[in-house]
Amino acid sequence: MGKRMKKVLASAMSLSMVASMAMSGVGATTSRVDSLLSNMSLRQKITQMMMVDFRQWKTADDEAKSDFTKMNSEVQKIVEDYDFGSVIFFANNIKETEQSFDLTMDLQKAATKDNGIPLLITTDQEGGIVYRLGSGTALPGNMALGATGDVNNAKIAGEIIGSELSSLGINTTLAPVVDVNNNANNPVIGLRSYGEDAEMVGKMASAEIEGLAEYNVIGCAKHFPGHGDTATDSHYGLPMVDKSKEELLNNELKPYQVAINQGIEMIMSAHILYPQLDDTTVYSEQTKKQEKLPSTLSHKILTNLLKEEMGFKGVVVTDAMNMAGIAATYDEVQAVKLAINAGVDLICMPTNITCLEDMSKLDAIIDGVEKAVNDGEIQESRLDDAVTRILTLKENKGILDWKESNYSLEKALATVGSDENKAKEREIAAKAVTVVKNENNTLPLNVTKKSKVLLVAAENNQRSLMKYGAERAKNAGLIPDGAEVKVTRYMDRTLASDATVINADGSTYTSSMTDLLDWCDTLVVVSDNSGLNVAKAHYNNNYTGTPYNLVDYVEKADASKTTVVISANKPYDVQMYPNADAIMAVYGSKGDPTEQLIGGATGSTSASGPNITAGVEVAFGVFGASGKLPVRIPKYVLTTNV
C-alpha cells in the first residue's frame, strides 16, 4: 500500500514547501500539514496513528525469536510499506551505541523510502529503574531527583537524556513520569515518581521537560490522569482510583496542568478506572459482558477533561495496549477503536509483532478501524484530528525534514555515556542520598588503618557498585592503607529462583557469612525493598529480612561494632532496622549488568545505576548527605506473620 502513495505524499510536501516560501510561522506549518493530510489514504491515516515495536524478531530462516538489534529485510519491507507514525525501542533493541545508531538510521531510511513520512523514534528513557540505552547514562531516577530538592538537577537529567537520545536519532522519550506517588503500596510507580507532593512533582517535571527541549527531544508526561495512588500494576491488572474530579484537580492533575501550560507535546494515558470521572460501560467482544472504561478508552477523560477542559493541544498516546489493563478485557480491534473514539491520537503497540505471520493481526486491526470509519462508528474527522496533531508535532520538531546527513556516529560515540554525563550523574546521585538515622554521628565512617569493613550487597550486580564506591573513597584518602574492605552479597539470583546465602530467619548462616560477620567491625548492608507491600514489615522476606538479621547478628555479637543500612529501593523500609546505627536512602537498586567494576581497568561500558555507589561514598565521607525524603513513611505493622 505504501510506495505509490508515498510518492503522492512527497509531491504534496514539495508543493507545500514551495507555497510556504511566501508564508511564515504557523501558516507555513499548517499549509504543509494540511497538504500532507489531504493526500493520505484512510489506511495511511490509521497506520500513522500507530506506534509499533519490533522488540524481538524471528525471520523465516530463524528457529527462534531473538532481540531485534539490526535491520533485516523483513522488517525493512514492513516499515517501507506501512506508514507507521512511530516505532518504539526497548532495551532489547538499543544495547550499544554504534548498533543503536545504525538501527535508528536504518528505520528512518526505510520509512522515508520513496519520500515517506519520517518516524517518531521513541523509547522509555526515564532514568533510574526505567532506562533503555544499554551504553547510556542511567541517572539516579525521579525519586532521587525529588530527594535533592533542586529543580536544576531535574533539568540536568533532562539534558543528559536529551543529548544522548538526540545523538542517536531517537527523537522522543516517554518521560517524565509525573504521577504523584501518594500510595506507598504502589507496585509500579514508586521510584519513577519525583515524590508525593504534587507541587514539587510539577516543578521537577517542568525542569526535566525544559532539559529535553534543549536537545529538541519530545517529552511525554505520563500516566494520565495519574497512576500514583494505585495498589495494582496495570501491566498485570486493571487498577481503580475512586477519587472525585475535585480531588484529582487538587493533587494528581496539578503536574499535568503545569506541563500543559509549559507546552508539553505528548501525554500518555493510563489503563486505570476512574469511576467518578467516567462510569460508562460498553459491551466487550472478548468477555461478552458490559465492562467499565479505563482512562485510555474514556472520551470523558481524554477528550472532555484533558483536551477540552485542561487545554492540551498535543498528541495523546496510549500506554502499551498489550498490558492486562486493556488486553484482559478487550480484544485488539475493539480496544483500538474505543481508544480512537476516546481521543487517543497515537496507539502504542496495538499488537505484538515478532514475525511476518504476526502482520495478519495488525492488518486485522487496520481493517477493523477502516470498516468502523466506513460504517460511521468512527468519524474520519477524528482520524484527521489525530493525524494533524502527529504531523504538526513532526513539523514543529523538524522531523519531517529528516536527513541521515544531520547525524554523526562520531558525535553519538562521544555523547552517549560520556565522562561528562557520568560525572553529572554521580553528583546528582550523591546529592540525593538521605541520612534517615545517624546515631552518635556514625556517618561518615571513621575508618582507621585497623578497620575491617564488610560491604554486603543484595545481589552480584550490586556488589561491583559497592566495591567501586569503596575504591573512590580510598582514592579520596578516606580509607587508609592497612584498612581492610571486603564485599559480598546475600542473594544468589538465578533464572529459576532466588536462594539466600543466609536464611532470612537467621536460623542457619553459612560458615563463610558467619566468618565475615565475626571478622568485621563495620557492616554496611543493602536493603532492597523492591515491590514489597509496605503494610507490614517483611522480616521473613529475603530482601529485607536477611539484612535485618545480618544487622541483628552483628549487634548482638558485639554492640561496639558499627552497622549501616542502605535502603536501595523505595525508602519505606528505612524503619525496619531499629538496631542499626545509621540508615540512609539512595532511591535506586540498579546494578552493573556486566558485574564489572565501572571505571577501572575492567570497567563496564554498560549503563549502571549510580545510587548504591553514591550511598557507599556518602558512608565513607566522599560526599556529604543533603537529601530529604520526598515521601512520607507509613508506620509498619511489626509482625513476621505475613
Where are these regions (language model features)?
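Gram-positive cell-envelope targeting signals
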Residues: 1-29
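Preference for extracellular/luminal or secreted protein segments
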Residues: 27-80, 116, 299, 308, ...
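Short, well-ordered alpha-helical
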Residues: 32, 36-38, 42-130, 178-192, ...
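Second-shell residues forming the walls of enzyme active-site clefts
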Residues: 38-41, 62-67, 71-74, 96-115, ...
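Structural recognition of the beta-strand scaffold that forms the well-ordered cores
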Residues: 48-53, 85-90, 118-123, 129-131, ...
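Short acidic, glycine-rich surface-loop motifs adjacent to enzyme active sites
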Residues: 53-57, 74-97, 174, 184, ...
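Flexible hinge/switch segments at interdomain interfaces of large molecular machines
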Residues: 132-136, 175-183, 224-230, 359, ...
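A charged helix-plus-loop insertion that forms the helical arch/lid used to bind
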Residues: 138-149, 195
